[in-house]
Curated annotation (Swiss-Prot):
Residues 1-37, 1304-1366 are annotated as: Disordered. Keywords: DNA-directed RNA polymerase, Metal-binding, Nucleotidyltransferase, Transcription, Transferase, Zinc. Residues 1354-1366 have a biased composition (Low complexity). This is DNA-directed RNA polymerase subunit beta'. Residues 1-23 have a biased composition (Basic residues). One of its GO terms (cellular component) is DNA-directed RNA polymerase complex. It comes from Prochlorococcus marinus subsp. pastoris (strain CCMP1986 / NIES-2087 / MED4). InterPro entries: DNA-dir_RpoC2_beta_pp (IPR012756), DNA-dir_RpoC_beta_prime (IPR045867), RNA_pol_Rpb1_3 (IPR007066), RNA_pol_Rpb1_3_sf (IPR042102), RNA_pol_Rpb1_4 (IPR007083), RNA_pol_Rpb1_5 (IPR007081), Rpb1_funnel_sf (IPR038120).
């Protein structure tokens, strides 16, 4: 058996002197006890325990053989049994219908309470959900009992029960009920799926069911990715944690407390930090002993409540963990081996179960009830609260009135009648609920109280729910509500209820009035069906001629022509082309304009309606444009529409024919600078249209462009004449001399040219176009209103090209366009101009263009009664073609009454229109006949079942309207309970329709406990995220002082600290105080509810301890408290999901997160303020300071999330391979960092053997060889970190462990001058040695041979008083 242990472990564990002995005691070859026979069912859990026991007792081989046999056994019987599932195996328990019936009865009762206004909407919802949750649980029990008693060998039951496949929650859905589902927002739908998959779901249930199914699939997909990333970050942060030492020798430890007298598995495999004695002083566990299950049991039986154990959290090994602090390796239940990569194991252990955690759980109302114990009376008696009791009224989440204890006290039930019974005593904790009154007589088995475990002041958050009205009518408040106007910081005014009370809606027929409608009947008037209740009129804004259009849909359009303009001087000519209809306007003198719009379209002011087709300004070819002096244009943002002429003048045009081609040069049929006649073929198949000089542009033997320029070429060698002209060209006026022999009697455009024949001038003729100052327009007639919009036609001349522009074209171009645009004045922007055609009055064959501005009024058609507007009847007050003035009524709409009743108008503020009115109908009232005198009076509000008169009860809810001796008239109403602080959306007397919001209930529900869970919560903890709306923590110990403010809600919270200074704490909206006045609090304690910000907690703990203890102790203690908190929080998440992880794994990760401190003040050290550095390093530096008398560095501990900790590691290779590669490498290069390749990652990247497992011994040997002739510099297994304790010859001072920073003088005091003087006085040659006491060692080689302290130097320093004797 022993030989089954791998050989390598003996090599790695070579430092354990008694490892062999241990080995034998842990793994006996045969059990001492004879085999025992156990007759019980072995399910999944029992199988797990069996294999685990075999492995721990008998080792790998025996366990493997046993597991193999068990497998064969299982398969053998599974083959014979032939287990399969058929539909018949899904047996629905008979109790199901009864259970569902009971639940429905409870819910009906709850709904009735809600209808009577006894509970709020929130309480109803919570109660319904709790009822179904409880029913579901009871149904699961019924399913279990049904299978157990009637069919224990049922296939489905066996599979789920043995753990082979499926679980109870799945079986429940198959044969119980599917249960409650959550919607995509995570809120529970209060309609449960009552059926199961065996019975089949209804359509509604199927749709609701698919919500949950989809959520499950999406969650699984996201969870896998999130969990993988979490594992990667954990591995990165902890990869360099390797067991490198036997024992770090720390005196620090952590405390493990027993839970209900039991330690469970929390002590197993941990080493005791001190001797553990029982109550009589006998030693149970010596110091540094591994606690195995039997020792753990012994501790429990000895009633030991807390044990100090060693932990990676308190291990003082430098950058690693020692064997004693880590304890057992859980793989083989032995002390961990040297070189074990415990960091990676920890990361895997925490990351791997990530996929098993749910992403989030949703809020199920009433979570709180499960955590509290209901106490019932055991005897009949009288309740006594005692003098200490402090209670206040409280309403439970289900709407039950109760009392809540504010302090802890003892409640007694004093027996009445029987003297033999003893009084029942109940310890009531603060926050517990009491369902009895002081002095009340009660029977036995009555619910007395609901005790909350511990002083749990629940962390709650505010949530809201809308109250929706489900009948139309008039709103009335109960007086108790006491609405109050509250103004928030932004100045918004809201109406809030101050007390719990009812908001009533009294039934009636409510009518919505259109915006401009006015009631025509006074209040309290009796109305019949068809009575006109209100009238709304529609009037014309500008007036004009009426046109009635055919009605479309449910409205009819009335058009009023406010302005029209007839283009009487133009004929409209229609021309059909293949691309569609074209329209032209022809004036009396024959000028033709192209119409840019078509009849029937709408145009806006300033739009061009037509262009003048003017052939006078059309050229034959392309060319160059020049403006003669005097011609000017307006500046325009864009040249798209041309340039508007501001001043007329002459436009000069130099023709030039340009062919843009893309052909091979071989196709060219003329030469560059050759004169050609019109019609010459210049390139194959391309002919010139004008005579002139050819210019050829080519690139890479490809023809690009051929230009033909008109004019005559004159050779000229005279440089003086040539210098007057450029290649771009220049205009020459008539009579101006150019060259001899050339007379110019017109304007010429002269260009300098160089041809193959020589230099010369090209004289080009210029065409002149005269542009008038304004375009000529035929006369127009138009109608102008006295008031309102008017129209005008305007002609605009636009030049197509700017001065100096070259138009490359063969075809002609249009140089000037004349546009006709329409302008409207005094029109509103939304008014458009309609284009119409009308026949000429004298000649019907001629059509004219008419431009009109229309005012369009939509008139509602009659409607037969709808739910909110009633019946409407609309009458037109005008006829077709009638002329109306501005303000004349066009149509009136009447709102007609639907049923007979009495009209009531709401109270309105003067100047505000009435938007709704109500008719109280006969069916909204109930007449209740009575014989005796009524016990109610007019104005009283009653609910179903209230007494009206002797023997007569109300049959409905509502308000008493009339009381006589024979009858009572009740107006039907509906009460809605609103809780304090609810926001009221309606005022007393408002009229509401069905579906309107009445109020917004503000209620408290448990916070975060059941909102963020599973993976996101783990991530939040390990990344040390700052939660939103975190709680306020006490900064320093002291006594709480709570003062009520002037305003009801405002409370001031302060703490009187030890030195009598007062710290005030600013409370945020909705924060509940968790402490009471006069309570003693310590730093880091919760003052208000909410999630804890771990960074704040560390700050508060450190700030408080810093005043009481030395800096180093305060830092260690505050870090230690935070570490325990973090470990417990992470464990809680995993435990809540049923995942078991050993504490030590989480401790390794948390150790990495809390190992750094931030330097606040460097003192005399060479550290930098703001630098993040290992706590150990600062400790060593400050120790050196205390020896040499320098000012120590001041620091604060910091908590880093796993990502940040990974990036802040000493190894830049590891950090760069994780995230932000460029930044990490750049910074490392600038700082000139060295990577000491301590972790696994760095070594893998470089390609070296990793310093763990079998590579660890090589690592130690390598370090030993580095140490050279001073092997004692290395501690026993320091894992490569020189331990300076061994550098202590008799004559040295007590040397500190020196920090790891660059080699420079550490100190400013004593100064370099002091040292120099001391050396000189004692005759020490400064070049002969390097002083360990005065210099900072190198980063890795902490002390080399020549750095050993010089005895003469040290004696000299002591004489000078600069060093105290160590």
């Amino acid at each position: 058996m022993t030989s089954s242990k791998p050989k390598k472990s003996s090599r790695v564990r070579k430092t354990t002197k008694n490892s062999k002995k241990n080995h034998n005691t842990m793994m006996p070859l045969l059990p001492k006890t004879p085999p025992s026979f156990k007759n019980k069912v072995v399910d999944k859990k029992a199988l797990k325990n069996l294999v685990s026991w075999a492995y721990k007792t008998h080792g790998t081989a025996v366990t493997a053989a046993m597991a193999d046999n068990l497998k064969d056994l299982g398969f053998k019987y599974a083959t014979q049994a032939a287990v399969s599932i058929s539909v018949n195996d899904l047996k629905v328990p008979e109790a199901k219908q009864d259970l569902i019936g009971q639940a429905e009865a409870q819910i009906t009762a709850t709904e009735e309470c809600y209808r009577l206004g006894e509970i709020t909407e929130v309480e109803r919802h919570t109660k319904v959900i709790d009822t179904w949750t409880e029913t579901n649980e009871r149904l699961v029990d019924a399913v279990k009992n049904n299978f157990n008693q009637n069919d224990p060998l049922n296939s489905v039951w066996m599979m789920a029960n043995s753990g082979a496949r499926g679980n109870m929650s799945q079986v429940r859905q198959l044969v119980g009920m599917r249960g409650l589902m959550a919607n995509p927002q995570g809120e529970i739908i209060d309609l449960p799926i009552r059926t199961n998959f065996r019975e089949g779901l209804t359509v509604t249930e199927y749709v609701i069911s698919s919500y949950g199914a989809r959520k499950g699939l999406v969650d699984t997909a996201l969870r896998t990715a999130d969990s993988g990333y979490l594992t990667r970050r954990l591995v990165d942060v902890a990869q360099d944690v390797i067991v490198r030492e036997e024992d770090c020798g720390t005196e620090r430890s952590i405390v493990i407390n027993s839970e209900d007298g039991k330690f469970g598995s929390r002590l197993i495999g941990r080493l005791s930090a001190e001797d553990i004695l029982d109550s009589e002083g006998n030693l149970i566990v010596p110091k540094n002993t591994a606690i195995d299950p039997s020792l753990s049991k012994t501790l429990e039986t000895s009633l030991i409540s807390k044990v100090n154990i060693r932990s990676p959290l308190t291990c003082e090994a430098n950058r690693s963990v020692c064997r004693k602090c880590y304890g057992w390796a859980l793989a083989h239940n032995h002390l961990v081996d040297l070189g074990e990569a415990v960091g990676i194991i920890a990361a895997q252990s925490i990351g791997e179960p990530g996929t098993q955690l749910t992403m989030r759980t949703f809020h199920t109302g009433g979570v709180s009830t499960a955590e509290s114990g209901v106490v019932r009376s055991k005897i009949k008696g009288k309740v006594e609260f005692g003098s200490k009791a402090k209670i206040r009224g409280y309403r439970t989440p289900h709407g039950v009135e109760a009392k809540q204890a504010e302090v802890d006290f003892l409640l007694k039930i004093i027996p009445t009648g029987s003297i033999t019974n003893k009084a029942q005593k109940i310890e009531v904790t603060s926050g517990s609920l009491l369902f009895v009154e002081d002095g009340q007589d009660i029977d036995s088995d009555i619910t007395v109280a609901q005790i909350t475990s511990g002083a749990v002041k629940k962390s709650v958050e505010k949530a809201t729910k809308d109250v929706i009205c489900d009948l139309a009518g008039e709103v009335r408040y109960d007086k108790v509500i006491q609405p109050k106007e509250v103004t928030d910081r932004q100045g918004n005014i809201t109406l809030k209820a101050q007390r719990l009370g009812r908001l009533w809606v009294l039934a009636g027929d409510v009518y919505n009035l259109p915006p401009n409608a006015k009631p025509v009947v006074s209040t309290e008037t009796k109305v019949e069906q068809g009575t006109v209740l209100a009238e709304a009129s529609q009037s014309s804004e500008f007036g004009g001629e009426v046109r009635l259009r055919e009605s479309v849909g449910d409205s009819r359009e009335v058009q009023i022509v406010t302005t029209s303009m007839l283009l009487s001087n133009f004929k409209l000519i229609e021309e059909s082309t293949h691309s569609g209809e074209l329209f032209h306007l022809e004036s009396n003198d024959g000028t033709i304009y192209r119409l840019n719009t078509s009849p029937g379209s709408k145009i806006s002011s300033g739009e061009v309606i037509a262009d003048l087709a003017d052939e006078r300004f059309r050229t034959k070819t392309g060319g160059l444009v020049k403006y003669a002096p005097g011609l000017s244009v307006k500046k325009a943002r864009s040249s798209k529409n041309g340039f508007e002429v501001s001043q007329g003048g002459t436009l000069l045009w130099i023709p030039q024919e340009t062919h843009e081609i893309n052909k091979d040069i071989s196709l060219l049929m003329t030469e560059d600078m050759e004169w050609i006649e019109a019609g010459t073929e210049v390139v194959k198949d391309i002919f010139s249209q004008t005579s002139g000089i050819v210019t050829v542009t080519q690139k890479n033997d490809i023809l690009r462009e051929i230009t033909v320029r008109n004019g005559s070429f004159h050779e000229c060698e005279d440089e003086e004449i040539l210098s007057r002209f450029t290649e771009e060209g220049k205009l020459v006026n008539p009579g101006e001399k150019i060259i001899d022999g050339v007379d110019n009697d017109e304007i010429l455009f002269v260009q300098k040219l160089e041809t193959s024949k020589g230099k010369g001038l090209l004289l080009r003729t210029v065409e002149e176009y005269t542009i008038p100052n304004e375009a000529e327009l035929p006369e127009l007639s138009h109608v102008k209103q006295e008031k309102g919009p008017s129209l005008a036609l305007k002609a605009i001349q636009r030049l197509s090209y700017k001065d100096g522009e070259l138009i490359k074209s063969v075809e002609g171009v249009e140089l000037l366009k004349t546009n006709l645009s329409i302008e409207s004045f005094d029109a509103t922007p939304q008014m458009t101009i309609d284009v119409e055609t009308i026949q000429d009055k004298s000649d019907k064959s001629i059509n004219r263009l008419n431009l009109v501005i229309l005012e369009s009024i939509l008139v509602r058609r009659d409607t037969i009664s709808d739910s909110s507007h009633g019946s409407t009847h609309t009458e037109l007050q005008i006829n077709n073609n009638q002329l109306v003035k501005a303000g004349d009524v066009i149509a009136t709409t009447q709102i007609l009454c639907k049923e007979r009743g009495v009209l009531q108008l709401p109270d309105s503020v003067e100047g505000e229109p009435i938007r709704r009115l109500i008719v109280e109908r006969n069916e909204d009232k109930i007449k209740i006949n009575i014989k005796d005198k009524a016990v109610v009076k007019t104005g009283d509000r009653v609910v179903d079942g209230d007494l009206i008169s002797k023997g007569v009860k109300s049959t409905s809810c509502g308000e008493i309207e009339e009381v006589s001796s024979e009858y009572v008239i009740l107006r039907i109403g509906r009460p809605y309970m609103v809780s304090p602080d609810s926001v009221l959306h309606v005022k007393d007397g408002d009229l509401v329709l069905r579906g309107d919001g009445l109020a917004l209930l503000v209620f408290e529900r448990q916070k975060t406990g059941d909102i963020v869970q599973g993976l996101p919560r783990i991530e939040e903890l390990l990344e040390a995220r700052r939660p939103r709306d975190s709680s306020i923590l006490c900064k320093k110990s002291g006594v709480v002082q709570i003062k009520e403010g002037t305003d009801e809600e405002s409370v001031s919270l302060s703490v009187i600290e030890r030195d009598d200074s007062i710290s005030e704490y600013q409370l945020l909206m909705g924060q509940n105080i968790m402490v009471s006045d006069g309570q003693q609090v310590t730093g880091g304690e919760l003052l208000t509810d909410g999630p804890i910000n771990p960074h704040d907690l560390l700050d508060c703990l450190f700030t408080d301890l810093k005043d009481q203890k030395p800096l180093m102790e305060a830092a260690q203690e505050s870090i230690s408290k935070l570490q325990r908190k973090m470990v417990n929080e992470v464990q809680n998440v995993y435990k809540s999901q049923g995942v078991a992880i050993s504490d030590k794994h989480i401790e390794v990760i948390v150790r990495q997160m809390t190992s750094k401190v931030r330097i606040e003040d460097a003192g005399d050290t060479t550290l930098l303020p703001g630098e993040l550095i290992e706590l150990r390093q600062v400790e060593d530096t400050n120790q050196a300071m205390s020896i040499t008398g320098g000012a120590p560095a001041e620091f604060t501990p910091v908590l880093l999330g796993i990502t940040k900790a990974s990036l802040n590691t000493d190894s830049f290779i590891s950090a760069a391979s994780f995230q932000e590669t460029t930044r990490v490498l750049t910074e490392a290069a600038i700082e000139g960092k060295s990577d000491w390749l301590r972790g696994l990652k760095e070594n893998v990247i470089i390609g070296r053997l990793i310093p763990a497992g079998t590579g660890f011994s090589g690592f130690v040997e390598e370090l030993a060889s580095e140490a050279g002739p001073h092997p004692d510099i290395l501690a026993e297994e320091s894992g490569g970190y020189r331990r300076t304790q061994n550098l202590r010859p008799d004559y040295t001072v007590d040397m500190p462990q020196t920090p790891i920073v660059s080699s420079t003088a550490i100190l400013d005091d004593p100064s370099d001058e002091d040292l120099e003087t001391t050396r000189n006085r004692h005759g020490i040659d400064p070049t002969s040695s390097n002083f360990a006491a005065f210099a900072r060692p190198n980063a890795e080689n902490q002390f080399s041979e020549d750095q050993l302290p010089d005895p003469a130097a040290l004696e000299g320093l002591q004489e000078e008083g600069l060093l105290s004797d160590g």
